[in-house]
Structures are given as C-alpha cells and as structure tokens.
Amino acid sequence: MAATSTAAVDQLAADLGNTSLDNKAAAPAPIDTSAVPEAQAEGAEAAPTPTAAPHPQASASLYVGELDPSVTEAMLFELFSQIGSVASIRVCRDAVTRRSLGYAYVNYNTTADGEKALEELNYTLIKGRPCRIMWSQRDPALRKTGAGNIFIKNLDAAIDNKALHDTFAAFGNILSCKVAQDEHGNSKGYGFVHYETDEAASQAIKHVNGMLLNEKKVYVGHHIPKKDRQSKFEEMKANFTNVYVKNINNEVTDEEFRELFAKFGEVTSSSLARDQEGKSRGFGFVNFTTHEAAAQAVDELNGKDFRGQDLYVGRAQKKHEREEELRKSYEAARLEKANKYQGVNLYIKNLGDDVDDDKLRAMFSEYGPITSAKVMRDSLIEGSEEKDEKDKENKKEGETKEEEQNEGSEKKTEKKGDRKLGKSKGFGFVCFSNPDDATKAVTEMNQRMVDGKPLYVALAQRKDVRKSQLEASIQARNQLRMQQAAAQAGMPQQYMQAPVYYAGQQPGFMPAPGGRGVPFPQGGIVPGVQGGRPGQYPYQQGGRGGVPPQQMPPMGYPINQFGPGAFPPNTPQYMAAMGQVGALGGGRGGPAGRGPQGIPAGIPQGLQGGPAVPGYPPAGRPQNGGGRGTPRGNANFMAAGRGASPIPGAPADLSAGSFLQAQLATTQDPQAQKQIIGENLFPKIQAIQPALAGKITGMLLEMDNAELINLFEDDNALNVKVQEALAVYDEYLKTQGQQPTQQPAEANGEQPKAEEQKPEEQKA
C-alpha cells in the first residue's frame, strides 16, 4: 500500500511538471486528485478530498482573512448563511478608530457546515477581493510553530491564492495558502502554503522544488522564521568573501583590476561594471575563496590611491541591506535632532493673520534667548497671480502702451515680493535655547489674549507622539463611557463583551453568560419609535416599538436608556417635551401629579416631573414647601427657583465653559461639536440681537472651538464678536443695495406700529 501511494504521488508530480497556471495559455488536462490506491478503493467509503478533510477540533469557527476594510458583518452573514446555520459573525476592528482590521471570524453551529464553507467559499470574491478561509486556531503556540509551513518564491505574476492552493493541494490537507501582494494587489512573486502535517510539506518540497510553473522555475523549501534568517544573515556578514570596489579610474582594465586583488589570496571571480558602450562605470566586484583574504583586501586597499583616485573597498551588500542601513542612519539623525530640541521648541496656534516671524519673536523674546521663530504659511499659486495681473492690465484702455508696460513691470516686482509670504496658517513655532525659558513662556503665554484671540502655547510634539496620546485618551474615554453605561443598565462590568453579529438578530452585544445581561446603548436611541408606523422597525407591533428579551435593535439604533420613545437631553425634541410638562397642571390632583399618564411622550422616565441632572433635586420631590406637581404655566422649569445657569441644563456650581467642554468631550465628530456649541450659543446671542440671532450664530461658528468656549466665560468678548458680525453683515447688505441693520428701526415704520399694539395686548 505504501509503494502504491508513493507511485500515485510521483504520478501527480509528473503531471505538475507541465502545468500552466496562466488563464490565457492553453492548459493541459487538470490533475485528477480523486484517484486513490486500489487498496483504498476496495473499502466501503472513499476518503474525502484534502481540503474537505474533517477538522480534529470540535469547534466550527472559521477565520476569514484578506477582507476589504468596508466589509461588514451583514455582508459576511449573507454569504456564509447560504452554507448553513450561522451562530455568530464578528469583524475585528481597531479599538480606537473602529476601522476594520481586514479579517473576521464566522462561527457555525455544526462542524459539517464549517467544512462545507471552507470547501466552497474559500477564495470567493468579496467586494472585489478574494477572501482566505481557514480553521480558527485559538492557541497561538500551534499557529507559530511553523510545522508544515513551506515557502515558495519566483512565482509568476498570474498565480494567485486559488491557483497556488490548487497546485499544492495534491500533497495533503492545506490549512492556509497565501500569495504575498503589494498595496495595489499585485503579486510579489512569493507565497506560503501551510500543511496539516510535516510529511505533506516534505512531499511538496520533494516534487515541486525546481519545477516549472508558468514557465518559471520555482523554489520550494521549509519556511524559516525571520529571527532564524536574521541570525544566519549576521553569520554570513561576519564571514563575507565578496568585496565591492568603487571610485575606480575609467582607464583601468579587467586584468589590472584582478591583479590588484590577487596578491591577497585566490580570486574566484572579478568584474568591472560597464555601460552599453563598454565604458567602465567606476565600480566592480571581487570574490575570494576565503574570508581572511577578503578581509585583508578591505583593510589594506580601502582609501588607497590607485591610478590617481582613492579607492573604496568594502563588503558587498545587497540593495535591501543598503536601504535598511540608510533608513537607520536617517532615523538616528532624526531622533538626535528631536532630542536636541526636546523641551525647548514651542508650538503656538490661534495666531492672527498679521503675525509674522518678527512679531512672533518679539512676543516671546522677553522670556529668554530665542534661536528661531517661524510662522507657517501657505504657498502662493503663481498662475492665479498672473491671471489677476492680466485682468487688471486689460482694463486700462485709455493708457499708452509705454505706461502699461511700466506699470506692468512695477506690479510684477511687487508680486514677486508678495510671493515670498503666503497667507498665515494660524500657527507657528518658537525655539528657545533654555528649557526653563520655554517652560516659563508656556506658563505665562498660554491662553493670553492677543489681537482678540486666546493663544494656545505648548511644547511641540512629533506627529506619532500626538497620535498615540490621542488614541490613548480616546480609548480611556470610551472605556469610561462603557462603564458608565453598564452601571446605568445594571450590568456588571465583567459581562461586557465585544460586539458580534448573531443569526436572526441585529448587531449588538453578546448576552452575559448565565444571566440576562442588558446591552448598553451605543451613542444613540430610536427617535420617536412609539409614534412610528407599524412594522417600521423589527419586532414593532401596533405602532409601538419594542425589543424582545435577549435581542438587539437595528444597527445604528441602540437600546433607549431613557425609556421607550424617549428623547435624550439637550435636543430640540427633549426641550419641546419639557415645555409641555410646564404647561400641565400641578398639585396632587393635577394631571402631572402621580402617574406617567399625564406626561407627554418623549420624556425620559427619570425626568418625569422634573429634570434629573446634576445640581438639581430629584424629580417629583417637593422643593421649598411646594407641591408634588410641576407649577402650572412654568415652561422654563429648569431655571425657575433654582438659580439659572448661562447654559440651560448646566449645574449651578459649574461654569458655562467647563460644562460646554464636558459636553464636547462626549463626541469626536467636528460637526456634532459645532452643533452642541451652536445650541448653547444661540440663546446668548438671541438676548443680544434677537432679529439676527440665527445668522450671527452661524457666522460665529466658523471660529475655533477653543475661542468659542471663551466667549461663554466673557460676555464682553461675546458682545464684541456680535458687533463685528453685525458690521460684516451690514457691509454685505450695502453691496446688495439693501438697508443696513444698524439704522434706526423707525425708518421703516415698524417700531411705532409695535408700540400701538402694546396697549391692546395688555388689555387682552
């Protein structure tokens, strides 16, 4: 039986000898992998194909790799559910950015479904990219042993993952197969095949190494880990025999070049590089039989004058090795430069447009000697300037030709001077000679008002350092948010698990094992589900939205922690609903007295009867001897009798700027942050300029968030900004031929009309 099996493998290898994997060329008949020895053919059942061999593990978990970043759990569920019942799907994502890492895990209920998916769906195109499927191996030691893993190089560019898999599947069960690709999806010419056993890997190396695949001779060998390759490479470097020589006189012949090195030992080969015309390129190579001879030649000839030129003689290096050494030298120089300016280089932003290098230096010169000061500017586009210049010259019709030429030359001179300084980017750098001076400048200049703008001054940091700090802060904030949400939902933190995709459910969080763990919200609620149409959302009946136990709401609509149909605080729907509460009757017998039947829809259960925010008493409790209900007609219940805050909903013991910063910390979306600032800024501007509050708010929102937060602390600065916005708007109205807003209102007759209506309103 063993002899028959060996003969079958030899026959497969012979068939591989003329295999062509190029789709364009006419390929011979495919290899018949279903052939089995006669001894096995007499059995009751035939053995399964290598790729469909049953996995020894009882788990039915598959690893799906090489995925496009835009692939979601829903796309994978639609594909893998065609094979059988899917238990769960999870696309692995970055903990901070939530971007896909390019791989996922698919769990089936039975191992048979997993084997079928591995057989039929491997290398299936998903979003234009073939996926790679293998059994999930949770033990990292088994994944990294390298047993059964082979390396193939010199592959043709037409060979992809599937073609490589089909070629090597004849020798045994393949766990994983991959052709290395660049960022554009092109083959790098090498790949890896991981067999289940070492015997299968040895058979593949024995029969395929040195054979032609797509008319290219391939190399197949055992995979050597990078650590072992590095140690072997260091050993080769220490025992080099090949020498590189440059700075050679162009008149030196091959014989003279060889004789120069022959005195140090036996030379196996020597060569001078020449161009197409046969002229020397000034460098060459010499290979010795022993390392000692090569080392002696390097020691004695390096820097020696030969035919009027100093030679460079050193160990011959490959291109990737030279690039690596060059990269290391650049990295060392960069780190040395960064360490040199550590603690003395300051970053300043929120600068005015009129601040140049000299003015920036003058601002910080009082704190100590400055080595350099630079304001970053945009580069000017010459094409736009030349076009403007031509337009101006075409308008001068009454001037003489000489005058036009003279003026044109003068303007060109001015334009050339202007091109040296582009528009300021609003930030710059100041480098001190002493770290103590830099620290003092940061302490005294940070948040100082200069030209109506608060400066931001801090120590300059490299981009990678800033990115790592930002990721760490975002991750810590997300973790704190998850803990707070878990505490509100009454779920222990140890039951918090990563989001997965369940069959028959929507994306959410895995239920806690052995309990009824309640998932926590993911940053939003179902807006107005109770008032929606029947069947608008899953599990909705009779126009009332609900989620059955242990199930998840639709993607993008997490469970509403404020109650069914409720709105979160600080939204227009929330404020409108609270206004309805103020209009309800108060007292023990009023509609808002005891039960939630008198509360309008959209109010969180925790806020029925009063606001449940920090700094306010619990909802529904009597305050200062008052009744249980909300006073009748009190629409502005948040400020009545409790000490109004500059921002509605802010605690009395917290400043407006601090409260706003706390709100902005809940989101990283710039558009959402602007919306939060606008909602809080509009009431303050409306008190100053009611008629144009909306326009002025929109104009001020173009400012930096840090500057806007300062406006909440300084009413005078806010008034100045409002007046500046009004002035800009008046200039715009003048250009449109309309009446400015700052003119008296009596001119159009509106104010007298309003005064005439006042007595009537009072009588009514």
Swiss-Prot record:
Disordered, as annotated region: 36-56, 375-420, 587-634, 735-764
Positions with biased composition (Basic and acidic residues): 387-399, 408-420, 752-764
Domain RRM: 60-138, 148-225, 241-318, 344-462
Compositionally biased residues, Polar residues: 735-745
Keywords on record: Cytoplasm, mRNA processing, mRNA transport, Nucleus, Repeat, RNA-binding, Translation regulation, Transport
Gene: pabp-1
Compositional bias segments (type: Low complexity): 597-613
Record-given protein name: Polyadenylate-binding protein, cytoplasmic and nuclear
Signal peptide: none
Pfam families: MLLE, RRM_1
GO cellular component: cytoplasmic stress granule; cytosol; nucleus; ribonucleoprotein complex
Primary site of residence: cytoplasm
Domain named PABC: residues: 657-734
Family label: Belongs to the polyadenylate-binding protein type-1 family.
Subcellular location per the Swiss-Prot or TrEMBL entry: Cytoplasm; Nucleus
Any one Gene Ontology BP term: regulation of translation
Gly residues compositional bias, start-end: 587-596
Organism: Neurospora crassa (strain ATCC 24698 / 74-OR23-1A / CBS 708.71 / DSM 1257 / FGSC 987)
GO molecular function, one term: mRNA 3'-UTR binding
Lineage: Eukaryota, Fungi, Dikarya, Ascomycota, Pezizomycotina
Function: Binds the poly(A) tail of mRNA. Appears to be an important mediator of the multiple roles of the poly(A) tail in mRNA biogenesis, stability and translation. In the nucleus, involved in both mRNA cleavage and polyadenylation. Is also required for efficient mRNA export to the cytoplasm. Acts in concert with a poly(A)-specific nuclease (PAN) to affect poly(A) tail shortening, which may occur concomitantly with either nucleocytoplasmic mRNA transport or translational initiation.
